[in-house]
Design a protein with these regions (language model features):
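Metal-dependent amide/peptide-bond hydrolase catalytic core
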Residues: 211-388
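Conserved acidic residues
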Residues: 48, 158-159, 345
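Non-cysteine beta-strand/loop elements that form the S-adenosyl-L-methionine
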Residues: 75-77, 189-191, 348-353
Length: 388
C-alpha cells in the first residue's frame, strides 16, 4: 500500500489544472474550452491518439502499453461539465462565470485523470491500451449515452470501463464500492390535475384541484411503504406544487412534479405503474382528472463483480485495505456512467472528499488533498486490469 511517488510530485501541477478548470465552468455539452484544455494536455503527454467531438464534445486519449505487448483496452472515465449554480466559496480560484460553477467536483475528476494519463503515457507499464475518457453532460444531459451511441466502445475496442466520483463526508484517503447497484435510476414526473374552478366561499360548486393534488401527494408515499418490498429501495419525492392565483379563488388546475429513484428494474416499473394509477384514480375519486407525464432518465448504475474486485483491490493498493469499504450502501443519486456499464462490464467507485460542503451546494469545492489518491488509484486500475 502506497501512493505513487509521482502522484505526490505532480500534485502542484495537477492542482493548478484543477483550479484553472474550476475558474472556467461550462454546462452540459457546451464544454468547448474545457475539452480543448483536456485535449491539449493529452497531446502534450504523448498519448498515441487523441480524438475530440465524441458524443458531441467528448474527448478520448488512447495510450498503448509497452512496445510489443498485446492486450485489451480499458476505459477510465471522468466527467467535464459544471452546474448552473452561483458559487459562494470565496476561493481565489472561484468561478469567473456568474451562475455557473463546478459544484460536483468534475474539475477534480478531470485533473486526477489527466495526472494519471501523464504517468501512464510516460511509464506504459501495462499490456494493452488505456482509453482515458472525458465526458460532457453528466449533469442531466446523458453525455455518457451520447458517447456510447457515437461508437466509442467499438472505435477504441474498450472491453472494460471504470468510473470514479468524489464523496463529501467520506474521509480523504478512503474509498467506497460494492458489486451490483451502486446508484439509482433517476426518473421525473409531472402531473396536471384539472378540476373546476370557482369561488372559495362556495367549494361545493367547484372541484378543488388543490385538495385533490394534496391527496395525491400523500398517497404517492404508499409506493414505498405499501407497494414495494421494504428491502428494494424506492424514493418518490414531490418537489413542486404549483397552483392558484388569488386567496378567494379555487383554481381550475394545479401542477405537481417530482422524482422517482429506484435500484432495480422491477421496482422502477412498479413505481411508474403505481404512480400513474394513484394519480388518475385519486383524481377520479374527487371528480377531477390527472394527466401524468413520466420521463425515464438515467438507469441504475450496476457494478459488475469481477471489475468491482479489480477496483476494490486497486483502491486497497492505493490506500490500504482498511481504507476501502467494499459493501457501501447504494446512493439514491443518479449517474450516467450507468450507460457505459450497460455497454461494457466495469465498476464505479467513490473516493473521499473529506469534510466539505455537499455536492451541488454553492459552497462546495473539490478537496485538492484527494488528488494523489485519485491519480494513484487510476494508475493501479490500469496496471491491474492490464497486467503485463
Amino acid at each position: 500500500m502506497a501512493l505513487l511517488p509521482e502522484s505526490i510530485e505532480m500534485k502542484n501541477d495537477v492542482t493548478g489544472w484543477r483550479r484553472y478548470l474550476h475558474e472556467r465552468p461550462e454546462i452540459l455539452y457546451d464544454v468547448h474550452e474545457t475539452a480543448g484544455f483536456v485535449a491539449g494536455k493529452l497531446k502534450e503527454f504523448g498519448c498515441d491518439e487523441v480524438v475530440t467531438g465524441l458524443g458531441r464534445t467528448g474527448v478520448v486519449g488512447l495510450i498503448h502499453g509497452r512496445e510489443g505487448s498485446n492486450g485489451p483496452t480499458v476505459g477510465l472515465r471522468a466527467d467535464m461539465d459544471a452546474l448552473p449554480i452561483n458559487e459562494i466559496t470565496g476561493a481565489n480560484w472561484a468561478s469567473r462565470t456568474p451562475g455557473k460553477m463546478h459544484a460536483c467536483g468534475h474539475d477534480g475528476h478531470m485533473a486526477m485523470l489527466l495526472g494519471a494519463a501523464r504517468h501512464l503515457a510516460k511509464t506504459r507499464n501495462f499490456a494493452g491500451s488505456v482509453a482515458v475518457i472525458f465526458q460532457p453532460a453528466e449533469e442531466g444531459g446523458a453525455g455518457g449515452l451520447a458517447m456510447v451511441q457515437d461508437g466509442m466502445m467499438e472505435r477504441f475496442g474498450i472491453e472494460r470501463v471504470f468510473g470514479m466520483h468524489n464523496l463529501p463526508g467520506l474521509p480523504v484517503g478512503q474509498f467506497a464500492i460494492k458489486p451490483g447497484p451502486i446508484t439509482a435510476s433517476t426518473d421525473e414526473f409531472a402531473i396536471t390535475v384539472t378540476g373546476r374552478g370557482g369561488h372559495a366561499a362556495m367549494p361545493h360548486l367547484a372541484v378543488d384541484p388543490i385538495v385533490t393534488g394534496s391527496a395525491i401527494v400523500t398517497a404517492l408515499q404508499t409506493i414505498a411503504s405499501r407497494n414495494g418490498n421494504p428491502l428494494d429501495s424506492v424514493v418518490c419525492s414531490v418537489t413542486k406544487f404549483n397552483g392558484g392565483f388569488a386567496h378567494n379563488v379555487i383554481p381550475e388546475t394545479i401542477k405537481l412534479a417530482g422524482t422517482v429513484r429506484t435500484l432495480t428494474p422491477h421496482m422502477r416499473d412498479l413505481a411508474e405503474e403505481r404512480l400513474r394509477q394513484i394519480a388518475t384514480g385519486i383524481a377520479a375519486s374527487y371528480g377531477a382528472t390527472a394527466d401524468v407525464n413520466y420521463q425515464r432518465s438515467y438507469p441504475v448504475t450496476v457494478n459488475h463483480p469481477f471489475e468491482t474486485a479489480i477496483a476494490g483491490d486497486s483502491a486497497a493498493l492505493t490506500a490500504g485495505e482498511e481504507q476501502v469499504d467494499r459493501a457501501v450502501d447504494p446512493m439514491m443519486g443518479g449517474e450516467d456512467f450507468a450507460y457505459m456499464l450497460e455497454a461494457r462490464p466495469g465498476a464505479f467507485i467513490f473516493i473521499g472528499n473529506g469534510d466539505s460542503a455537499s455536492l451541488h451546494h454553492p459552497a462546495y469545492d473539490f478537496n485538492d488533498e484527494v488528488i494523489p489518491y485519485g491519480i494513484s488509484y487510476w494508475v493501479n486500475v490500469a496496471e491491474r486490469a492490464l497486467a503485463a
